[in-house]
Regions:
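Catalytic core of non-heme Fe(II) oxygenases with the double-stranded beta-helix
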Residues: 28, 53, 57, 132-149, ...
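Ligand-binding loop in jelly-roll beta-barrel domains
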Residues: 28, 38, 79, 90-114, ...
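Glycine- and acidic-residue-biased ligand/ion/polar-headgroup-sensing regions
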Residues: 50-51, 60-75, 165-181, 187
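Fold-core signature of tandem repeat domains
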Residues: 47-49, 55, 67, 86, ...
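Short histidine-centered beta-strand/loop micro-motifs
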Residues: 45-46, 56-60, 77-78, 96-97, ...
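Short acidic-glycine-tyrosine-enriched beta hairpin
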Residues: 74-93, 179-199
Length: 227
């Protein structure tokens, strides 16, 4: 299966109700943002668990990255409330469940070779650092060999200078509206800007975004998955 699998293309996804599809596990649906592979896949998805859903214990051969967007996601290691960011490195396993239901942003098989760090951050209590331009605050989440992941908070009226992303950029708009010369991206929008793309983003109303840079074209454990 291939969904938005040409990583040289700019992709903008504004999720619609009809975009959600059932997974093999009852009570779990997903919206595929990009995907290469069948059930073992290099994948970026939104995943929704219905209340009282469970998922069988499984191992992540290529690692798993999760941001909890809504509800409480649980496994044998604890309860993970909204805003929790974690990385389960290659070879780790767990048995997910949820009592109230939850919505997750999930990336699979995208760990770099040699990246073995386990990460868990409750971002709603995390520290914010000054950004590179007035009106921006940044909460770093992870960095490995030039691939960086962070939350970025935009105050209303913030303008970022035009810049180029040699290693590409991926954004999930969590709150507010982000804009650039190509359009406006309200909360829930997912964007993938290819390598060497250029833009001048801004936010008139303010925004909170998840952003990953430097990963397109960088080595990942899922590179060997082709279909």
């Amino acid at each position: 299966m291939r969904v938005n699998a040409d990583f040289s293309q700019r992709i903008v996804v504004r999720p619609r109700p009809e975009d959600w599809v059932a997974s093999p596990q009852p009570g779990v649906t997903r919206l595929m943002l990009d995907r290469v592979g069948a059930e073992v896949a290099r994948a970026t998805s939104l995943v929704r668990y219905a209340p009282r859903s469970t998922f069988p214990a499984h191992t992540h051969g290529g690692g798993e990255e999760i941001l909890v967007l809504d509800g409480t996601f649980s496994d044998e290691f604890g309860d993970h409330p909204p805003g929790t960011y974690f990385r389960n490195p290659p070879g780790t396993s767990h048995a997910p469940r949820t009592e109230e239901g939850c919505l997750l942003f999930v990336k699979l098989w995208q760990f770099a070779p040699g990246d073995t760090a386990a990460v868990r951050i409750e971002t709603r209590g995390g520290a914010w650092l000054p950004g590179r331009t007035h009106g921006l605050e940044v909460m770093p989440l992870h960095e490995h060999q030039g691939v960086s992941t962070a939350l970025v908070r935009w105050a209303p009226g913030t303008q970022f200078p035009a810049h180029t992303h040699p290693g590409g950029e991926e954004i999930l708009v969590l709150e507010g509206t982000l804009e650039d010369e190509e359009g406006a991206y309200p909360a829930g929008t997912w964007l993938r800007n290819p390598r060497f793309s250029r833009h001048a983003p801004f936010s008139r109303e303010g925004a909170l975004i998840y952003v990953k840079v430097g990963h397109l074209g960088a080595p990942a454990l899922g590179d060997a998955i082709t279909a």
